[in-house]
Swiss-Prot record:
It is found in: Secreted. Inhibited by EDTA and EGTA. The modification Pyrrolidone carboxylic acid is found at residue 192. The record marks 378 as: Necessary, but not sufficient, for proteolytic processing. Expressed by the venom gland. The lineage of its organism: Eukaryota, Metazoa, Chordata, Craniata, Vertebrata. Belongs to the venom metalloproteinase (M12B) family. P-III subfamily. P-IIIb sub-subfamily. One of its GO terms (cellular component) is plasma membrane. Zn(2+) binds at residues 334, 338, 344. This is Zinc metalloproteinase-disintegrin-like bothropasin.
Amino acid sequence: MIEVLLVTICLAAFPYQGSSIILESGNVNDYEVVYPRKVTALPKGAVQPKYEDAMQYEFKVNGEPVVLHLEKNKGLFSKDYSETHYSPDGREITTYPAVEDHCYYHGRIENDADSTASISACNGLKGHFKLQRETYFIEPLKLSNSEAHAVFKYENVEKEDEAPKMCGVTQNWKSYEPIKKASQLVVTAEQQKYNPFRYVELFIVVDQGMVTKNNGDLDKIKARMYELANIVNEILRYLYMHAALVGLEIWSNGDKITVKPDVDYTLNSFAEWRKTDLLTRKKHDNAQLLTAIDFNGPTIGYAYIGSMCHPKRSVAIVEDYSPINLVVAVIMAHEMGHNLGIHHDTDFCSCGDYPCIMGPTISNEPSKFFSNCSYIQCWDFIMKENPQCILNEPLGTDIVSPPVCGNELLEVGEECDCGTPENCQNECCDAATCKLKSGSQCGHGDCCEQCKFSKSGTECRASMSECDPAEHCTGQSSECPADVFHKNGQPCLDNYGYCYNGNCPIMYHQCYALFGADVYEAEDSCFKDNQKGNYYGYCRKENGKKIPCAPEDVKCGRLYCKDNSPGQNNPCKMFYSNDDEHKGMVLPGTKCADGKVCSNGHCVDVATAY
C-alpha cells in the first residue's frame, strides 16, 4: 500500500506576471511567479530521505496546470568522486565527499512525450524544463518565508553581449562530402540494439578567475559545477552516452597553467598539464577547464577532434560566459562532442525543429539535441577508433545508496525493477517486491524471452565484422556473453588485412569512408609524399613536430586514394583538415605490406605488433 504525503503550498490561482527582476541567471525582464506544490509518494512507514529518489511537483505555467516528475540522477557522481582545492600556501587538499544523497534530478512533464527537465532541488527548484516544445527556466525568488519561484524564457534574459558566440574549432574541409553522406545515413534498429551505452568519466577543473568571479565562495562554485554536469549528462544521453563526474579541482590559490585569451595556447597548456599532472593523480576519461577569461574574438569553447581517451588531447576549454547553466552546459557538451569525433553541422544536418548542439555558432535559444550527422559521426568514431576508456560500465554494486524498489534501476538485492506498480509494464516482474514472478527465470536482458532464458545458441550480439564474431546465449543466463574479438593480427578479408580490435582495417574501406564509391587505394608512388614531413605528409607527431616517414613506413602516414568517380581523375587524392590533422591518416592496424601492419607510424611485423 502506498501512502501519499501532500506537502501543500499555497498555489496562486492566477500567476503573477513580473516585469523585471535580478536572478542568479541574470536580469530577467519578463517572468511569471509560481508556487510549486510538492506531492511525495512513499511506502507506508518509510523514513523520508532528505532528497527522495523520485519527486513530483505541481504548478501553473501560463495559467495551465503542469505536473513535473523528477528522478534523481543516480549516475551523476562516480563512486570514487573527489574534490581538490588549494590552501593559501599552495597545499593540495583532496576530499571524498558523500554525494549519494544529492539533489540533482532529470525529469519530464506529465502528458508531454517530448518534454525534458534538468533540475536542482537543493534550495527550491532551479533549472529548466521543456514544455510544449518551448524551453522554460525556473528559479527561486529567494523571498523571505515564501515558496515563490520565477518561470521565464531564455529570450527574456537580458544579454550583456548580443554578438554571436562560436566554437573555436574551424573547419577547412577539402570536401563536404563526408558530412553530406553522414546526413543521409540511417543507423538501423539492429545496430542500435548492439550499441551499448558508453560511459565518460568527466573531470572538471575551475581556474582562479572563476574563484575571483564568485568572490572565493567554493561551495557556490561546486554547486554550479554539479548543475552543469547534470545538464551535460542529460544532453549526452541522446548519443547513448552517460557522463559521470569523477572529480572537481578548483585552482583556489592560483592557476596551474597560464590561462590566456589565445585558445590554441590555453588548450595545449591544459592538455599537457592534464597528461603530466592530473592523470597521475586521478583516473578519468575526459577533462574540461572552465575559465572566467574572455577568449579572443567570439570564441567560447575549443577542443581537439576525435581525441576521447587520448592521454593528452582528451580535453576541452570552455569560457563561463553566461550565468545561465544550460547555456554553458551546451558548450561543454558541444566540445565533448568534438572529442567524440563529431564535426560542426552543415546545412545537410538536422535535429528536427530545434537548433542543434554542434552548430558552429550559438543560437538564440540553447540547443539540447545532436543532429543526425552528429550521431553518425560519433558512431563512426567509436566503431573505427574503438576508444577503450569509455567502455567500462559502472556495475550495480557501484551504487552505494540503498536499493529502492520502484526506481527502475536494478540494484543490489533486486531481481528486477520495472518502476511503480502503476507504471510497470514488465510481465515477469513483481513491481511491489522487485522479485521475479513465480515461474519466471528472468525479467530483462538480451537473452530473456517471455520471462525465460533464450535457448542456447540464440544470437544476442551480431557480428560487426569478420574480426568480431557474433555472441550467442548460453541458455543459463539472461545476459549476453561479453563481446569477444578475434586475436589482433589474425588475417581477414582474404588476407587483404589483419584483425585489429574487432575490425579489419584496409585502405580501400578507409578511402570509401572519406570519399565514397569508386575510390580505391592509390598506387605506391603516391605515398612517397609522406617522406616530406610537411603539413600533410608525415608519419607521426612527436612533441608537436611532424616526423617524416622512413621509406619503409610511407604507407603508415597520410592515406592516398585513387578517385575513379565520374568527372574525377585524381590518382593521388588525400584528405587534410587544419582543425583535425589526424583525420585522413592511415588507421592503426592497417596492412602496410605482407605480414606487416601500421603501429604508431611504423610498418612493423604483425607477429610483434601486438
